[in-house]
Amino acid sequence: MKDESETDERNHLEGVEEGEIVDAEPDTLSLTPEQHERLKSLIHGSDLFDEITNAENRYLIFGRNEGELGERRKKLQQLLDSRRSATAFRLEDFGLTSDDIHLWAPAFDVLSETATHVVGVLEDYDGGHVWEMGLLYYRQSNVRDTLWILKRTYEDDDLQRERYDNGMAASHIAALEESIADRVVTWRTEDDLEEAVKKVP
C-alpha cells in the first residue's frame, strides 16, 4: 500500500508547498485543490516549461499588458528571447486568462523561482504587476536578487507624480527599488528602452 504522504508529495507543484497555498492565512496564496491541479497542468504541462528549464538564461517578464504598454513589454520579451541560450516568457504564455485570476499570483511565485532573471517593465503603479512586485517585496528575498526593473520616467513632473503616486504601493515599490538600486534602469522613449535592456545580463 502506498504511503499517502508520498502520493501527496508527488502531486505537489514544483516550487510551491501545498500547505503554503491551501491554508487560508492572510499572507499566503490560497488555492483550492482543483485550482492547484489546474496550475500544475498549465505550467508543467506546457512545452514552454521544458524549453525554459533547458535554457541557460531564463527571463520572466512582467508589467502592463494593455495597448502600447503591452506592446513595449512584448518587444522587450523578443529582445531578451533572441539572445543565445536564452528564453523569455510571460505568465500569459502559459495560457492563463482573466478567468484564472486566482492562479496568477502563485504562477508568478513558481515561475519567478524558475527564472534566472525577473524583469519588470514599469511605466506606472497601476495594474496587476504592482501586486507581483508587492509579492517580491514581502515574500521572496532570494528572487529579489534576480530582479531588474526598467522604469520609465517622464519629463513632466505632474505626469510623473500621476503615474507613480499610488499611496501604499508607492512606498512599498520604492523600498523594493531601493533594495536593488543598481538594477533599476530608467528610460523615457522606446529607443531608450532598447538601450536599457542591454544592461540586463
Model-based region annotation:
Residues 1-201:
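Conserved catalytic or regulatory cores that recognize and/or transform ribose-phosphate-containing ligands
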